[in-house]
Amino acid sequence: MTPMQEPHSPVQGSHFDIAPIAAEMRGEAGYEHSGHTARALVRESDLRVMLLVMKAGSVIKEHSAKETASVYTVSGHLRVRLPTGVVDVPSGRLLVLERGLVHSVEAVEESSFLLSRGSHEKP
């Protein structure tokens, strides 16, 4: 998937080779300027999956989401700051955040991770 492509629809099933996409993203201007960038892999009304890449030492400032979210570290090591403390999320680990939870994300080392969010609508 290139930067100009739309996110995939899961109608027929979607699969992604994450490493080359992340490598491509590290060449983007946003990555060079802010230390991180994101790309939508899937954008549906009930599910969004984003791939994010971060330079070591970069931070995504404190924020919250309307939806329950999961963070799966594909490579590297993330440190997530929550109101209750700090959670380390190294490669291969999954962190689930309840909706509305204020948090920030720091890349302890160069990292890539998948952010998945469900619908903010209650069933």
Language model feature labels by segment:
Residues 1-46, 81:
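A short, N-terminal "cap"/entry segment at the start of jelly-roll beta-barrel domains
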Residues 84-99:
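Short acidic-glycine-tyrosine-enriched beta hairpin
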Residues 74-75, 90-91, 109:
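A cytosolic small-molecule/anion-sensing beta-strand core signal
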Residues 99-123:
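Ligand-binding loop in jelly-roll beta-barrel domains
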Residues 77-79, 86, 102, 112:
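Structural motif
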Residues 60-62, 80-81, 97, 102-108:
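Short beta-strand His + acidic residue motifs that chelate non-heme Fe in jelly-roll/DSBH
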Residues 33-35, 48-65, 99:
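Conserved short histidine dyad/triad with adjacent acidic residue
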Residues 53-55, 64-79:
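Short, conserved beta-strand element in jelly-roll/cupin
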